[in-house]
Amino acid sequence: GSANIKILDIQRSSVSNVLNKFKDQFYLTSINENKLFGVYTTSSRPGELATIEDGKIKVLSEFNEIVLSQYSLGKTNEINYQAPDGTDVQGWYIVPPDFDKNKKYPLVLIIHGGPHAMYRPQFNYLWHQFASDGYVVLYTNPRGSTGYGSDFANVIDNDYPGQGDLSDLLAGVDHVTDLGFIDEDNMYVQGCSG
């Protein structure tokens, strides 16, 4: 999913992206001429103060370095898969820091609330804690999520929770399980309000 920062040029009646192929998260807080100020986070880095200027991100702070230097984090991997009816779904999974593809790990499926919300590859302390405790953490954007167009978000109208979003979530579990490192007897679900 995407929620890009865009510039609207009223004189030219044009819209352009501030960053191309941006997959992380930037919480915009202020604009000064051509410079944007905010908080920048990735799937493996908590938020830091940053600017965007001339299409480039510059991180200004290192508030989290003291804490991060004491821990090993698991790697976050993006996945794209299809539900049984052919619907394309995007998600991510985090593996434990000492991940070994030949071992079996318990799985935690994280489900977002909303339903009109979406996950992005942003840092989440709880998810990294689960991964540090030896779990694979899966989070996806099933039907009803924003960031994939209004048709994808609104397909669940009058059907939430419904078969489409459930099918998408279960297909994500199947996709990660098929990778061969999930203990199918130890799967858990954690979610937010819906």
Give the label of every model feature segment.
Residues G1, D9, N32, F37-S43, ...:
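Beta-strand C-termini and the immediately following turn/loop, strongest in propeller blades
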Residues G1, K21-V39, V67-E78, H128, ...:
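Conserved beta-propeller blade repeats
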Residues G1-A3, G191-G194:
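Short, intrinsically disordered, charge-balanced linker/junction segments flanking boundaries
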Residues G1-K6, K21-K23, Y40-A50, P142-G144:
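A flexible loop/linker signature enriched in serine peptidases of the S9 family
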Residues I5-I7, Y27-T29, I57:
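Short, exposed beta-strand/loop patches in secreted or surface proteins that constitute
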Residues K6-I10, I52, I94:
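Hydrophobic/aromatic beta-strand positions that recur at structurally equivalent sites within the blades
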Residues S14-L19, V59:
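A short beta-strand motif characteristic of beta-propeller blades
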Residues G55-K56, S61-C192:
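Cap/lid segment of the alpha/beta-hydrolase catalytic domain
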